[in-house]
Structure formats: structure tokens, C-alpha cells
């Protein structure tokens, strides 16, 4: 059997603040989840995302400490267009979330930005810099006479 990625787990110091942030990014998280120490949702396509409070993590691993410095993880959200990257970045920073990298046209062909979730972890927002063009099927080749 080949292992497959099934779930991404996030540790949070403030469940309500974290869930509010990810709801703003379009994740459908059931109402009332803020009161739970562990929350899981299944995304379209089957991948699950889960949040655990720091207390839950410490109950499983008493030596766990909150990471400091650098990014340990960075979820990335695909936006529909470069304009949506800019608008979502502006919306989130206006709502008080930290902006880490303002939207810019990255050399790898994306409009790219990074905001900070309530725990200070980076969350990428990106879209192709230019919309993909539909491919035109090539004409069948004909043998030379």
C-alpha cells in the first residue's frame, strides 16, 4: 500500500480566531466549532484539514513547545485571478490580519502574496499571472506524397 496525504493538521493558540480567519478564505467550517479543542473539515477532493489547540497537542506530547522563528508550514490558496489575490490581501489586512508579503508578480509566473493567520503563520495567496489559454488541438498530420 502506498501512503497518501489525507489530512493537514494545524496547531492554534486561539481556535476561534483561527477558524474565523480560514472562514474568510472560503473554508466551510461548521458553526460552533470555535468551542471545540479539535476541529476537522473535509475539503472538496477529500483532503482534510484539522485544527488542534495547543492544550490538545500538549496532552499528547507534554514536551511540545510553540515553534518560534521561520515558517513551519504555509497553506497556499489558489485565487481565480491576480485581481482576486490583490483584493483578498487588502480585505484580510484591512480586517487586522498581518500582511507578510504584499502582492507582487513573482518570477515563476504567479501573482503572489502572503498574509499571517492569527498564530503568525504565513498563508499564501496566488493566481497565475496570465490566465491559461485553451489549447487548440493540432491538425492531424498527413503523410507526404
Residue spans of the language-model regions?
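Amphipathic alpha-helical segments
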Residues: 14-29
Amino acid at each position: 500500500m502506498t501512503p497518501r496525504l489525507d489530512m493537514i493538521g494545524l496547531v492554534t493558540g486561539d481556535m476561534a480566531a483561527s477558524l474565523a480567519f480560514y472562514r474568510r478564505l472560503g473554508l466551510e467550517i461548521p458553526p460552533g466549532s470555535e468551542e471545540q479543542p479539535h476541529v476537522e473539515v473535509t475539503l472538496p477532493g477529500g483532503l482534510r484539514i484539522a485544527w488542534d489547540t495547543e492544550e490538545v497537542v500538549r496532552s499528547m506530547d507534554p514536551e511540545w513547545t510553540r515553534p518560534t522563528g521561520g515558517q513551519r508550514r504555509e497553506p497556499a490558496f489558489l485565487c481565480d485571478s491576480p485581481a482576486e489575490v490583490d483584493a483578498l490581501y487588502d480585505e484580510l489586512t484591512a480586517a487586522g490580519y498581518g500582511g507578510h508579503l504584499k502582492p507582487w508578480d513573482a518570477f515563476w509566473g504567479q501573482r503572489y502574496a502572503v498574509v499571517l493567520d492569527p498564530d503568525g503563520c504565513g498563508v499564501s495567496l496566488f493566481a497565475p499571472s496570465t490566465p491559461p489559454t485553451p489549447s487548440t488541438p493540432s491538425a492531424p498530420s498527413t503523410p507526404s506524397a
